[in-house]
């Protein structure tokens, strides 16, 4: 079986909450219709991934609640988010922002911490899912902290795997944590894989050995609880959605170096 994927925009965590991705969604969050709100910590809440996640939380107030929000420097946006979503804790990496951030949320019973180390500790506070959306290597300490605590981490930070893949996956395996890709093509692969492993590749586009592409559907949305053997997937053909080579002529690709 071959999986063909082409995504032109970041789907982040949004499609995981969409009906078309119900199998993957239920694997990450459990049954969001159970009546018990899923607790989220959002690392990088003032960035693109964080804002997209909060938009879904706002649209589904009975399904999700915010335990902690973490940002880098934008204390004004973080304070506004905190007043709307009422987390128990918020963190700002920029220690100089601690004073104004505390003043902005005073009287709302929200614990405020500052500094990269303290923000990383917030990632270990028990929740259902930690959304890791901090950009670059700055996001690595909080990802490691979450996995060391056995958390389920919705990972939008590719740099964590590029720079410390063995450490990240090792911590997840050693402590019962889970890594869930939620950024762009990585999430697309995950969702297709979960659908394929559950009753025949739900809602994905597949191509057989002859290259013909066909749509398949399966209406079963029950959660997957076991690990899945990828041996049945022969090849993944992943087209780029952007990056530094987006406008490069095809004839120049042979000159690309690591």
Language-model segments: what does each one mean?
Residues 141, 158-177:
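Rossmann-fold NAD(P)-binding glycine/threonine-rich loop
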Residues 134, 151-162:
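ADP-ribose/adenylate-binding Rossmann-like module
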Residues 114-145:
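Beta-loop-alpha module in the N-terminal Rossmann-like domain of NAD(P)-dependent dehydrogenases
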Residues 67-105, 110-111, 116, 123:
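Glycine-rich nucleotide/cofactor/substrate-binding loop typically near the N-terminus or early
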Residues 24-90:
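N-terminal Rossmann-like dinucleotide-binding module
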Residues 168-186, 235-236:
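Rossmann-fold dehydrogenase core element
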Residues 194-203, 221-258:
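Conserved anion/nucleotide-ligand pocket segment
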């Amino acid at each position: 079986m071959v999986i063909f994927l082409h995504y032109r925009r970041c789907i982040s965590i949004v499609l995981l909450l969409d009906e078309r991705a119900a199998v993957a969604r239920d694997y990450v969050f459990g049954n969001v219709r159970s009546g018990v709100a899923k607790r989220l910590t959002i690392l990088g809440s003032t960035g693109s991934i964080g804002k997209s996640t909060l938009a879904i939380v706002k649209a589904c107030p009975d399904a999700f609640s915010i335990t902690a929000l973490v940002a880098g420097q934008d204390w004004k946006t973080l304070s506004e988010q905190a007043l709307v979503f009422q987390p128990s804790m918020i963190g700002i990496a920029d220690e100089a922002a601690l004073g104004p951030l505390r003043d902005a949320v005073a009287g709302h019973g929200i614990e405020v911490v500052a500094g990269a180390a303290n923000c990383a500790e917030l990632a270990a506070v028990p929740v259902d899912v930690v959304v890791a959306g901090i950009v670059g290597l700055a996001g690595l300490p909080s990802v490691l902290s979450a996995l060391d605590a056995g958390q389920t981490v919705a990972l939008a930070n590719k740099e964590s795997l590029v720079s410390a893949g063995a450490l990240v996956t090792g911590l997840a395996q050693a402590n019962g944590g889970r890594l869930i890709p939620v950024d762009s093509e990585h999430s697309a692969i995950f969702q297709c894989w979960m659908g394929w492993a559950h009753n025949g590749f739900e809602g994905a586009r597949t191509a057989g050995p002859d290259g013909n592409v066909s749509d398949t559907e399966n209406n079963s949305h029950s959660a997957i609880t076991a690990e899945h053997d990828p041996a049945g997937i022969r090849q993944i053909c992943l087209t780029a959605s952007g990056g530094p080579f987006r406008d490069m002529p095809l004839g120049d690709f042979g000159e690309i170096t690591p």
